[in-house]
A protein has these predicted regions:
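Short loop->beta transition adjacent to catalytic acidic/histidine clusters or analogous donor-positioning motifs
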Residues: 8, 44-53, 76-77, 104
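Short, flexible/disordered intra-domain loops and linkers
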Residues: 18-32, 188-193
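Conserved catalytic core of nucleotide-sugar-dependent glycosyltransferases
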Residues: 105, 114-190
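Short loop/turn segments at strand-loop or loop-helix junctions that form parts
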Residues: 8-19, 57-58, 138-141, 253-255
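C-terminal catalytic/acceptor-binding lobe
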Residues: 3-5, 178, 183-282
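Short, acidic, metal-binding catalytic loop of nucleotide-sugar glycosyltransferases
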Residues: 24-49
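Active-site-proximal specificity loops/subdomain of glycosyltransferases
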Residues: 60-104
Length: 282
């Protein structure tokens, strides 16, 4: 008998200002962007039974209405914060999803992702049917195919019309199991100072690109962000790199979602057409 009442537990953090990386639509209206993304997320969930924690970071009341129009009151838990920003709310997401008892599958969501309808169950199913897969990003990162950093051998698995490709980094939006999150929670919860380096964390968890001093030396000149991420991975997570479990991260192609950063659209999909087909409801 399944001990869980829901198929998925979600911690969805939302902030009322547009990112410094402008989105492809509604670059001057965060409320419309948030509504578009949230409506698309709801449509993508299909028939999944979802428990939602809403992390409102300095949000006016109208942002609560975005969620209350889409989910029943019993499926919503409100968490309010006074403008604590990304790093703090991310740690809260991890804490909430580790401690909850509603679902085995957990999803940490940021407010600037757009989803395709009825697609999210595919990500949940992939994790269920692949015990050696630990994390899934719904976003098929374009830089996986274009940058030197990601020029590494990849494994591909085919499931439900998607090619699922192994990779080693994503953002702070990802799907995993509650037990996996508990295993490696300290990597996500470590005090990284004023930064919250997602690339460094994923390097430590997947153990990719952290054992190549030649590349580190070269990138110290040509791409300091990559080199800096390797340094941060070792500085904060050396125990994980040397003694921890090696985790795997997977992304779908074609993508299930798009990170709303202009110029970083997931490949192979006409995203503008998708946005136009699902305008934000008033």
């Amino acid at each position: 008998m399944n001990e869980f009442k829901h198929d998925l537990a979600v911690a969805y953090r939302i902030y009322p200002k547009v990112s410094s990386h402008p989105p492809p639509v509604f670059a001057d209206d965060k409320l419309k962007l948030a509504r578009l993304c949230l409506n698309s997320f709801k449509a993508s969930l299909g028939n999944l039974r979802v428990k939602m924690w809403v992390l409102l970071d300095d949000c006016p009341p109208i942002y609560e209405e975005l969620f209350s129009r889409l989910w029943a009151p019993d499926d919503l838990v409100w968490m309010r914060y006074p403008g604590v920003k990304d790093a703090a709310t991310f740690r809260e997401q991890v804490r909430i999803l580790m401690e909850q008892t509603d679902a085995e599958m957990v999803y940490l969501a940021e407010d600037d992702y757009f989803y395709l309808p009825d697609q999210f169950p595919l990500a949940v199913n992939f994790l269920k049917h692949n015990p050696d897969a630990h994390f899934v990003s719904p976003y098929d990162h374009p830089d996986i195919y274009t940058t030197e950093l990601h020029k590494l051998p990849r494994e591909t698995r085919v499931a439900e019309g998607k090619n699922w490709n192994s990779c080693f980094s994503t953002t702070h939006t990802f799907l995993t199991r509650r037990d996996t999150l508990r295993e490696c929670n300290w990597v996500f919860l470590a005090p990284y100072g004023r930064v919250s380096p997602d690339l460094a964390k994923w390097m430590a968890l997947t153990k990719r690109r952290v054992f190549n001093p030649i590349a580190f030396a070269r990138w110290s000149v040509t791409c300091r962000f990559w080199a800096g991420s390797i340094f941060l991975a070792w500085y904060y997570c050396w125990r994980q790199i040397l003694f921890g479990k090696k985790y795997t991260l997977w992304v779908p192609h074609p993508s299930i979602a798009n990170h709303m950063v202009a110029g970083m659209e997931a490949p192979g999909i006409d995203w503008q057409k998708e946005f136009d087909q699902r305008p934000p409801k008033v």
